[in-house]
């Protein structure tokens, strides 16, 4: 918990606006605010007043004092609502610094809220998720996490797990009771229930990560196969130049869209071929690098006569780059220009037939993309999650499986050890046991005013 210093920052986005908010938090927040306003501020009252630097008026606005612990950070907090001109706001910041405050670090207000038990770590991360949400569903899901829905699931699970651990360890510590707890049906049923709950949370977390972080799609293929046309069709607008000249796209073209509320980061790349053009060759190198970062690759081809096209075909197109491409990457083969066919083949497995230019098959392709990443559109029950949550849940799931094995083998002490490991992984999600390095990494990704 912070007790000795007071921080200040602009809490509203950069740029001009009707209102700009300065946030001050810490032990001297009230004293500093009263120096700036020359007013005595009452808790939870909106006070209209001038804001001064010494005796010079900087601006006027509304000032609200939130007395600890009834504030966002759990400390004394003052918010100054001034005119949203960056020069004015920076003058107020300088005046606050002159009165003894210091500039807040990124995410420091929310970090203080976490350290003062105003919210747990999962809720703190949801603050960033709700700010950065790029779709309505993502925003609603982040709000669920911020309200504590995700944390409640974890805490309810922890209660069951701790009760089971107490029972198991008590039985080990008091063998004179001559109770063979390993044959107790309560142990078996309780462990099975915990296993099923972790599995359900594991699946929900996967959905939550998709909403929070989106899906990165990369379009690759030979020149003039229709990658840029497909990008425009998916985006619903002309984001990339489309011509009949091979090699038109020479650099990475990015577009951010939504499919059924799921954020999609689509990347169009230079056509894959051997080229003497220095710029085009550099574009191809960048394309190969982006393939390694993708959640899913759309391999666009107009070779609609060959439904058995494989990613190894790249070896023939650009053999010098083939070894740099992950062989286990998730690929959908998009057969373009089916409007030239008399009879349209049926979609099968990872092969989808479309006409990007005529918008044929695009909806089926979108549906296929969502299915491939495992998104099930459970709007009402999804909360946002982070990759670290998924990692923790996956680890907890593996160890709860080991716990079941130890129970079947009759190894009581090893069962207790596995249950403890599961508890530690679950605790890391809400921040019960979190290293300083982890906290620093999480809160440094926030904007300054949060």
Swiss-Prot record:
Q: Which InterPro entries match?
A: G_TrmE, GTP-bd, GTP-bd_TrmE_N, GTPase_MnmE, MnmE_dom2, MnmE_helical, P-loop_NTPase, Small_GTP-bd
Q: How is the cofactor bound?
A: Binds 1 potassium ion per subunit.
Where GTP binds, per the record, is at 224-229, 243-249, 268-271
Pfam families of this UniProt entry?
MMR_HSR1, MnmE_helical, TrmE_N
Entry cofactors: K(+)
Q: Which UniProt keywords apply?
A: Cytoplasm, GTP-binding, Hydrolase, Magnesium, Metal-binding, Nucleotide-binding, Potassium, tRNA processing
Gene3D superfamilies in UniProt: P-loop containing nucleotide triphosphate hydrolases (3.40.50.300), Probable tRNA modification gtpase trme, domain 1 (3.30.1360.120), tRNA modification GTPase MnmE domain 2 (1.20.120.430)
UniProt subcellular location:
Cytoplasm
Q: Top enzyme class of this protein?
A: hydrolase
- Give any GO molecular function from the UniProt entry: metal ion binding
Can the keyword Ribosomal protein be found in this entry's annotation?
no
Query: How does this chain assemble?
Result: Homodimer. Heterotetramer of two MnmE and two MnmG subunits.
The record's annotation in HAMAP family points to:
GTPase_MnmE
What does the sequence similarity comment in the record state about its family? Answer: Belongs to the TRAFAC class TrmE-Era-EngA-EngB-Septin-like GTPase superfamily. TrmE GTPase family.
Q: What's this protein's function?
A: Exhibits a very high intrinsic GTPase hydrolysis rate. Involved in the addition of a carboxymethylaminomethyl (cmnm) group at the wobble position (U34) of certain tRNAs, forming tRNA-cmnm(5)s(2)U34.
For this entry, the protein name equals: tRNA modification GTPase MnmE
């Amino acid at each position: 918990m912070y007790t000795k210093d007071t921080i200040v920052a602009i809490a509203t986005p950069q740029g001009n606006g009707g209102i700009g908010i300065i946030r001050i938090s810490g032990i001297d927040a009230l004293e500093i605010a009263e120096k700036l306003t020359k007013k005595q501020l009452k808790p939870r009252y909106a006070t209209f007043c001038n804001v001064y630097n010494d005796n010079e008026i900087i601006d006027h606005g509304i000032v609200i004092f939130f007395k600890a612990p009834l504030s966002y950070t759990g400390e004394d907090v003052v918010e100054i609502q001034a005119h949203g001109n960056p020069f004015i706001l920076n003058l107020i910041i300088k005046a606050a610094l002159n009165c003894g405050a210091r500039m807040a670090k990124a995410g420091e207000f929310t970090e203080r809220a976490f350290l003062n038990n105003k919210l747990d770590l999962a809720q703190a991360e949801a603050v960033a998720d709700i700010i950065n949400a790029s779709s309505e569903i993502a925003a609603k899901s982040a709000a669920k996490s911020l309200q504590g829905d995700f944390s409640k699931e974890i805490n309810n699970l922890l209660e069951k797990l701790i009760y089971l651990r107490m029972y198991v360890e008590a039985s080990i510590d008091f063998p004179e009771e001559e109770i063979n707890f390993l044959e107790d049906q309560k142990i078996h049923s309780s462990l099975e229930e915990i296993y099923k709950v972790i599995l359900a949370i594991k699946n929900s977390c996967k959905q939550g990560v998709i909403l929070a972080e989106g899906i990165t799609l990369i379009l690759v293929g030979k020149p003039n196969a229709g990658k840029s046309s497909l990008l425009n069709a998916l985006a619903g607008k002309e984001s990339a130049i489309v011509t009949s000249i091979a090699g038109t796209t020479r650099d990475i073209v990015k577009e951010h869209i939504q499919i059924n509320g799921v954020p999609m980061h689509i990347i169009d790349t230079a056509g894959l071929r051997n080229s003497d053009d220095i710029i085009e060759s550099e574009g191809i190198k960048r394309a190969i690098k982006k393939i390694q970062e993708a959640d899913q690759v759309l391999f666009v081809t107009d070779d609609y006569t060959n439904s058995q096209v494989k990613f190894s075909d790249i070896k023939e197109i650009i053999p010098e780059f083939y070894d740099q491409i992950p062989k286990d990457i998730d690929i959908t083969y998009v057969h373009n220009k089916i409007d030239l066919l008399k009879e349209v083949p049926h979609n099968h497995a990872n092969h989808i037939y479309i006409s990007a230019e005529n918008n044929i098959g695009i909806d089926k392709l979108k549906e296929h993309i969502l299915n491939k990443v495992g998104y099930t559109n459970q709007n009402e029950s999804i909360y946002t999650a982070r990759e670290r949550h998924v990692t923790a849940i996956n680890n907890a799931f593996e160890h709860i499986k080991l716990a079941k094995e130890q129970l079947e083998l009759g190894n009581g002490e090893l069962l207790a050890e596995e249950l403890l490991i599961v508890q530690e992984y679950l605790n890391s999600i809400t921040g019960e046991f979190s290293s300083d390095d982890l906290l620093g990494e999480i809160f440094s990704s926030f904007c300054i005013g949060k």
